[in-house]
């Protein structure tokens, strides 16, 4: 198990990579592309500070919600989001991270509850983070029914994938 300070190490990346592929194999949803999961991280870690690397990774990989919302903001759609890899990533986290005791289902439930309890705050954070892209769909109060629908769809798809993989 690794704590936050150790996550920039090659040792952590390799443990995460093995865990990710192990979960995919155990759930019978492994794909060849999973051999390349987070493959850029150890190389970029040689030239970038970890925080910069982490941000770059999350905005450029199809299994992170940051990628999903950036694509929605830019193109008003995200047809290529990898829900399955997201679920596998969430599931394998509790094998490698000390501060992630929850499995994928518990993590999705927790994140969805945070969203439902603070819907307007959650949407506001998305709008602020991606303000360059979402300006035209926000009303004068800073709200957007469109974003709420997209967030609901995002969680609905995560729950469907949890069920399909067998982690519900």
Walk through the language-model features, giving the residues of each:
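Metal-dependent phosphohydrolase cores
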Residues: 1-168
């Amino acid at each position: 198990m690794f704590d936050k300070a150790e996550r920039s190490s090659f040792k952590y990346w390799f443990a995460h990579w093995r865990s990710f592929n192990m979960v995919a194999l155990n759930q019978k949803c492994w794909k060849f592309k999973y051999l390349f999961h987070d493959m850029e991280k150890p190389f970029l870690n040689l030239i970038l500070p970890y925080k910069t690397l982490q941000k770059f990774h999350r905005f450029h990989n199809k299994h992170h919600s940051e990628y999903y919302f950036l694509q929605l903001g830019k193109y008003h759609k995200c047809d290529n989001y990898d829900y399955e890899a997201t679920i596998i990533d969430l599931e394998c986290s509790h094998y490698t991270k000390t501060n992630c005791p929850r499995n994928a289902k518990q993590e999705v439930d927790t994140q969805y509850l945070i969203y439902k309890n603070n819907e307007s705050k959650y949407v506001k954070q998305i709008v602020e983070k991606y303000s360059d892209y979402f300006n035209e769909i926000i009303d004068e109060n800073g709200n957007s029914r469109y974003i709420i629908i997209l967030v609901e769809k995002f969680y609905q798809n995560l729950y469907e994938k949890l069920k399909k993989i067998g982690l519900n």
